[in-house]
Amino acid sequence: MLSSLNVLQSSFRGKTALSNSTLLQKVSFAGKEYPLEPIDEKTPILFQWFEARPERYEKGEVPILNTKEHPYLSNIINAAKIENERIIGVLVDGNFTYEQKKEFLSLENEYQNIKIIYRADVDFSMYDKKLSDIYLENIHKQESYPASERDNYLLGLLREELKNIPEGKDSLIESYAEKREHTWFDFFRNLAMLKAGSLFTETGKTGCHNISPCSGCIYLDADMIITDKLGVLYAPDGIAVHVDCNDEIKSLENGAIVVNRSNHPALLAGLDIMKSKVDAHPYYDGLGKGIKRHFNYSSLHDYNAFCDFIEFKHENIIPNTSMYTCSSW
């Protein structure tokens, strides 16, 4: 058996001519072995553009940022041209006008493998939980402690926020649907990757008949540039994510997420964390802690080694190009 790092490096090169022995490779972490699951050449690629300021676009423009500094629409179109045998989804949200929606339709008509998926058209209800239930569970948890151990300040805040939940808005999903900052992106990205293949089949998009509702998905930030076909990918237990490295300090990132099936248990673990905390964060808790929990990572382990184990990288992807420019927000 190859070491986990070597297996991942050799497998994530987009090579499609792999021997049977490669398909049987396993990698290990925390004393447990995991198969390197394949994600085939037909697995759809998903981009995301949630637009907080749709009014900034001119008439006739597709409302996805496309400037010299942030050529995100061009990157998506480039991916559709290179990966012309894959479906390229774009999950969008925002207060788009009728004319802007017509521009999205024109984009789909020009590039037949691009599918615009409106967040509001996707049924995410199976992942929802009442906000009141989350608050009540945390209130009851505090109340169960001996009086000397309770955080009375926190208890007061929880009770106050419970009372202030707007009528008709008692929903974790709805609370994020109304946000207009990065957690809006991050939360629905997690849900979209839980849906994976079913994100395409349930929304009735033409040309998606070959996608299984149980199949996986490849998410890429719009600042990632595809230079050639990705081929077959491999991921430990069917999941891998982008890893950033700054001054030799590594960190899990959500700029690329690969799953080989819908409802991946690592993402479900993250969703459970999101449903248990009143201050949960979709990036740190919903993705990072969910993956760590799934693979039994603890502070006793080497974090950089865990990042090497779970890292998705590919020689045909230039990642995180927006790091060289100012924020697109």
Curated annotation (Swiss-Prot):
It is an enzyme of class 2 (transferase). Auto-glycosylated: arginine GlcNAcylation is required for activity toward death domain-containing host target proteins. Pfam families: SseK_NleB. Protein-arginine N-acetylglucosaminyltransferase activity is inhibited by 100066N compound (flavone analog) and 102644N compound (a substituted isoxazole). Keywords: Glycoprotein, Glycosyltransferase, Host cytoplasm, Manganese, Metal-binding, Secreted, Toxin, Transferase, Virulence. GO terms for cellular component: extracellular region; host cell cytoplasm. UDP-N-acetyl-alpha-D-glucosamine binds at residues 48-50, 72, 219-222, 322, 327-329. GO terms for molecular function: manganese ion binding; protein-arginine N-acetylglucosaminyltransferase activity; toxin activity. The active site is at 253 (proton acceptor). The keyword Cell wall biogenesis/degradation does not apply. One of its GO terms (biological process) is symbiont-mediated perturbation of host intracellular transport. Mn(2+) binds at residues 223, 320, 322. A motif (DXD motif) lies at residues 221-223. Coiled coil: none annotated. Its cofactor is Mn(2+). Its EC number is 2.4.1.-. It is found in: Secreted; Host cytoplasm. The keyword Protein biosynthesis does not apply. Glycans are attached at residues 13, 53, 159, 293. It catalyses: L-arginyl-[protein] + UDP-N-acetyl-alpha-D-glucosamine = N(omega)-(N-acetyl-beta-D-glucosaminyl)-L-arginyl-[protein] + UDP + H(+). Protein-arginine N-acetylglucosaminyltransferase effector that disrupts TNF signaling in infected cells, including NF-kappa-B signaling, apoptosis and necroptosis. Acts by catalyzing the transfer of a single N-acetylglucosamine (GlcNAc) to a conserved arginine residue in the death domain of host proteins such as FADD: arginine GlcNAcylation prevents homotypic/heterotypic death domain interactions and assembly of the oligomeric TNF-alpha receptor complex, thereby disrupting TNF signaling. NCBIfam families: PRK15382.1 (NF011909). Adopts a GT-A fold and acts as an inverting enzyme that converts the alpha-configuration in the UDP-N-acetyl-alpha-D-glucosamine donor to the beta configuration in the N-linked (GlcNAc) arginine product. Belongs to the glycosyltransferase NleB family. This is Protein-arginine N-acetylglucosaminyltransferase NleB1.
